[in-house]
């Protein structure tokens, strides 16, 4: 097999994102490091690139950046902030996201599974795509961040809404090309900072207002029925 063919064979099946240089320059080294790990790695390998698989570049309308996957087994499945539908109680950041959505729109999803957002063009991308179980930020030095940089560069070749929650996400704004974008910057929804500018930001209605002004369909963030609050009571 020629070197170029071998590099192509190593690339995950992530549609148009597979053409990013990251998969030739960085992924082989990261993959080798993961293969040497003795700790449990989250999410499972088949879900590691789920965000890119579910929201290809041509469908991406909104990008919500996260940090790294939840380090609790059974929670992370490859989309930032999202958890499997049977997870209760919700992680605290996601709980705050839903509280803000309920205040903004009067409703929120019934579970923590955000796959329906991804299907509508919301790219839920962590800047680091793996984590050792129980060790938040345990893989921050593997080089994953280069993928996020390249995704931002490619996605910003056309108007896109970017949600940058917290200082770490906001540092990546420099990788967004100038353009007719919506860039929302607030405090992170974590309990430590949510009251310093995240609550009251009305980010979900702001994104939909921007999309509809461009003649695009809004994101259905949740069932239009009013939230009953059950996910907040567990």
Swiss-Prot record:
Superkingdom of this protein's organism: Bacteria
Residues at the active site: 68
SUPFAM superfamilies on file: Uracil-DNA glycosylase-like
Reactions that this protein is recorded to catalyse: Hydrolyzes single-stranded DNA or mismatched double-stranded DNA and polynucleotides, releasing free uracil
Gene Ontology cellular component list: cytoplasm
The enzyme's E.C. designation: 3.2.2.27
InterPro entries: UDG_fam1, Ura-DNA_Glyclase_AS, Uracil-DNA_glycosylase-like, Uracil-DNA_glycosylase-like_sf
Function: Excises uracil residues from the DNA which can arise as a result of misincorporation of dUMP residues by DNA polymerase or due to deamination of cytosine.
Protein name: Uracil-DNA glycosylase
Organism the protein comes from: Ruegeria sp. (strain TM1040) (Silicibacter sp.)
Lineage start: Bacteria, Pseudomonadati, Pseudomonadota, Alphaproteobacteria, Rhodobacterales
Gene responsible for this protein: ung
């Amino acid at each position: 097999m020629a070197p170029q063919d071998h590099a192509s064979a190593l690339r995950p099946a992530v549609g148009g994102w597979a053409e990013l240089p990251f998969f030739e320059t960085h992924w082989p080294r990261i993959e080798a490091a993961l293969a040497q790990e003795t700790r449990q790695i989250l999410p499972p390998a088949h879900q590691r690139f789920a965000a890119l698989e579910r929201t290809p570049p041509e469908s991406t309308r909104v990008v919500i950046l996260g940090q790294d996957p939840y380090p609790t087994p059974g929670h992370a499945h490859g989309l930032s902030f999202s958890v499997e539908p049977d997870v209760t109680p919700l992680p605290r950041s996601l709980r705050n996201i839903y509280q803000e959505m309920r205040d903004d729109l009067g409703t929120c999803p019934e579970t923590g599974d955000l796959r329906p957002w991804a299907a509508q063009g919301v790219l839920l991308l962590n800047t680091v795509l793996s984590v050792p179980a129980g060790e938040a930020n345990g893989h921050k030095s593997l080089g994953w961040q280069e993928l996020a940089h390249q995704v931002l560069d490619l996605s910003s070749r056309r108007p896109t809404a970017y949600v940058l929650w917290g200082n770490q996400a906001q540092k990546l704004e420099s990788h967004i090309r100038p353009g007719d974008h919506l860039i929302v910057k607030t405090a992170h929804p974590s309990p430590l900072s949510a009251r310093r500018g995240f609550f009251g930001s009305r980010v979900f209605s702001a994104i939909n207002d921007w999309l509809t002004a461009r003649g695009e369909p809004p994101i259905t963030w949740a069932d239009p029925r009013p939230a009953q609050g059950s996910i907040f009571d567990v």
